[in-house]
Each structure stands twice: as C-alpha cells, then as structure tokens.
Amino acid sequence: MPKQTPTIKDVAAYAGVSVTTVTNVLHGRGHRFSEETRQKVLRAVEALGYRPNQVARSLVRRRSYTLGVVVEHFRGALLGNPYFSTLLDGVLAEAVQAGYQLKIIALTSSDIEHVRQRTEDGSIDGAILAAPLHQSPLLQWAQECPLPCVVAGSSPPDLRATCVDVDDENAVYQGVKWLIAQGHRRIAFIAGPVNYWSAHQREQGYLRALSEAGIFITSHWIRRGNYSTESGRWAMEKLLQVRPPFSAVVCCNDWMALGALEALRRRGICVPEEISVMGFDDVEAAAVASPPLTTIRQPVREIGMRAAKLLIQQIESGTRTPERVIFPGELVQRDSTTAFAPETADTSKHPAAVRRVRRRRTY
C-alpha cells in the first residue's frame, strides 16, 4: 500500500501547533510566532517530508509563488561571480523556506520596457533588483514597479524603495581609520568602477578618513579598477611608480586586492613588511591568499536573505511601505597588514620599500 502524502494538518499535529501557525511559518510571517515555534514547524516539515501543493496554492491565491531576481548587464558568468552567487544563495534559502521559487531575469541592457516585459507578465509575484548600476534606469523602475520590489546592494540612499545593503562608506572609513591607528599615513586606494554606487561610497569612506586625520589627499594615490584581479594588478603597478611612496593600500574589493598582492609578489615586495594590503568583501579566496588577506566583510548572504524576507512580507501583506535595512561592515584582520614604524623606513630596495614592526595576529 503506497505511503500517504503528509498534509498541512499532519505537520500541525506533529509540531503541536495550529494549522494557521504552520501556514504563517511557511509563508514567512515572522511577526506572528516565536522562533521556537518556527523551528518546531520546520522540524515537523522535514520529519514528515511535507511539500506544499504549489499548483493548488497558485490557483487559489492567483499567485505564481515565484520571486524574480533581476540582474542587469548580464555577461554570462552570473554563478561564477562570488557576490551574485552568494546573494542568490541567501535569496534562495529564504524563498524556499517560505514556499517560493526563483526566476533569474538576466538582462543584457537597462532598458525599462524590456524589464517590464520580463517581470509584469504574471510569472513572478515580486522582484529583487540585485546590485544595480549607478544611475541605472532600473532604479526608477524599482520605485514605480506595480509589483513589490526590493533593491539588494549598491542602493542610493535617496531611493524611494525598500533597500537592503551594507554601509559601504562607513565600512571603508573604519578600515582606513584602523590603518591610521597602526601608524600608516600614506595610504593608497584602488577604487572600483564609477558605475556602481557601492564603489563610490567606499571611495568616499577612504577620503573621509584621511581628511579627518589631517592627511593630505593626493589623486596620485588613487587608481581605478573594474573589480577584476587583472585590474588590481594593473592598478598596483601604476601605484608603485608614485612618489612619495605609500605604506598601505586599500582595495575596493578582494579580487583587486588579490591582483595587487600578485603584482607586489612579482616585484619582490614583501607583504605586509613593506606594504600592507586591505580588501573588501571577504570572499573565500581571501582567507587562503598568501599572505591571508585583511579585509572588510560584508554579509552578502544575509543581505540576500533579508531582501527575500522583506519582499515576501510585501507580497503576503499587500503593503509596500519603503524601508532601508543597512548592515555594518566588519574588519577581518589577517596577515596582509601590520603596524608601520616610520622611524625605520628604508627605501633601498624600491620606491615603496619600508620596514615595519611586526604585530601579533588578532581576530
């Protein structure tokens, strides 16, 4: 005799809660139950192998139970991009828990009519705009979209839409302040692409920290990359030609920092004894770099999860009051940075050569 398919009533009985509570948990209505109750329901779902009838739910509620994730200027390597793959992982985790699936809407341009055709055809219940470009027409679309919409990452502060992001400006500001406290005064910066708001904010954090410390800011210490390892190598080669030499460099993302490390290694420049290097993101490769990379961690997966949760709440409640959720960055100290001792400076090896007091690792 075939095993009977478990129902929502079976889940409720197993967890010792009402059917309504099970429904609220599966739909992500977190304000209506405790975390303990949520875990009981999820354990019951797993133990019984319960799967909601997606087709029946869609017919009854006239929903697709699908979240759209919109990515503009797609170049064919979405899952190979650590930022987007991690963001999607967070979105997917929250969506599946609430009984939703994902539809990736990869655009080769920022044409609003194109995105409307792909999102307003009834195939999705709401959209997450993933790290849009600065001044992208899609930002205007996010504010006017007839569907619930959340912007995840690289969101301008004046956007009239629900946004989930990291405090890019303050994160880099705190990182540069930490380097200054370690004795560094000549700090270079490898900036990101001008078409991302997040890159602009990180550069502003760098400039603010130097300005507040009374450090003269020279444009010669700033080179711009495109977030790739190769652009980080190129930028570092250019920076090594600058006079006066710098003692530390902050990079707008980890991949450019890894490229900078490679350029220094090719020149025979020791990190951190001669130049300290700091990145941003804390990708997996940062921890296994040589030396392990000091960086600023942003909670990309958590950003994706919160964006999906807020979007589902908008879909389920029918309300769309814009809100802005900002996560702090976190400095992760590894071996690519150390304290600077100006009295022991030695430029005999190359323009950027200096000696430093070695510090004990702290985490």
Task: Name each region found by the language model.
Residues 107-111, 130-135, 255:
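Short beta->alpha connector loops
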Residues 39, 48-116:
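Amphipathic helical "hinge" segments at domain boundaries
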Residues 1-3, 14, 47, 88-100, ...:
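Bacterial carbohydrate/catabolite-sensing allosteric modules
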